[in-house]
């Protein structure tokens, strides 16, 4: 008697009927097993979770955007207001276009943003938080790694590859995303007596290459990044509605502003001090100052919104340590809480940490490194110390590397 062979198997994973719990039949002798159904459902669920579709009514008003920025970014009030308005107007323009509203009578230009401020003043955090508020894809690129096509380094199109990767290559979502390009001041034109001796492959050439992307055009993007080659398939990305935010320290820009104001000459020093006291010199920046710095006019023209950030004060650095939702002190306190231990920082300790960040000229960015240095030994020791109920960090721990005070539970 012939043995009947069971030929039914899952068309997705190839497992036979006796290897799975359920095998569901479809048309044309196709089947899917319960395991693959569960995987498909999980994929659909994840895609819904990371959906970037949003309606105009879902875009927070400028006041709401700033309020959320306040939860993560301390200080920089003027910059937060400028960014809130610019981002709101940018996405309002997109939704008006999607709704089919006529914009023929007035051309609404894209509000790309240029952030100018010292290291650790919050430029990257502002851009990242904006993307989080709006639930849009976000990517960060470093301008120093970009070079002209044909030279060692990254093509400018690679900044769009990162954006595509951030939303699993959902082109429609990427086309509403935010790209932050850091250290944009490092691609300023080289200057000197004879600047043409060596080709400026990471300066003016990169600015020219970025022009096409930031102004809004359809760009051929290599899907896996890297250099383009003739046989490679490209993904077409329309950058018209992508918001580009560029940030840089622009060291020396203040001197250019002073020269323009005519306040670097003898007899005007008192007036310079007055300007410095009343408002940061950077707030007086004009496009011509950036052009003199080394940015090309066409590039600066693509960034109509300029927001300046000032160096953070000691008080603001202390607030950064304790106030934001992701404040470092809160994070360490939670880690100690999981060990059943209370962690306390004295006010003087927090101020010493802030002073050290100012001394290192690292701003808020350097706070974590300082905290890690302070906490490394005690975090190593506490889990092995029985009966510890509180750890107190005072100024001597920060300044003199002394041991923190330990409070133990009293034996019954």
From Swiss-Prot:
GO terms for biological process: cell division; proteolysis involved in protein catabolic process. It comes from the Bacteria. GO terms for molecular function: ATP binding; ATP hydrolysis activity; ATP-dependent protein folding chaperone; protein dimerization activity; unfolded protein binding; zinc ion binding. Keywords: ATP-binding, Chaperone, Metal-binding, Nucleotide-binding, Zinc. Residues 1-52 form the ClpX-type ZB domain. Zn(2+) binds at residues 10, 13, 33, 36. It holds the Pfam family zf-C4_ClpX. GO terms for cellular component: HslUV protease complex. ATP binds at residues 118-125. Component of the ClpX-ClpP complex. Forms a hexameric ring that, in the presence of ATP, binds to fourteen ClpP subunits assembled into a disk-like structure with a central cavity, resembling the structure of eukaryotic proteasomes. Belongs to the ClpX chaperone family. ATP-dependent specificity component of the Clp protease. It directs the protease to specific substrates. Can perform chaperone functions in the absence of ClpP. This is ATP-dependent Clp protease ATP-binding subunit ClpX. It comes from Aquifex aeolicus (strain VF5). The lineage of its organism: Bacteria, Pseudomonadati, Aquificota, Aquificia, Aquificales.
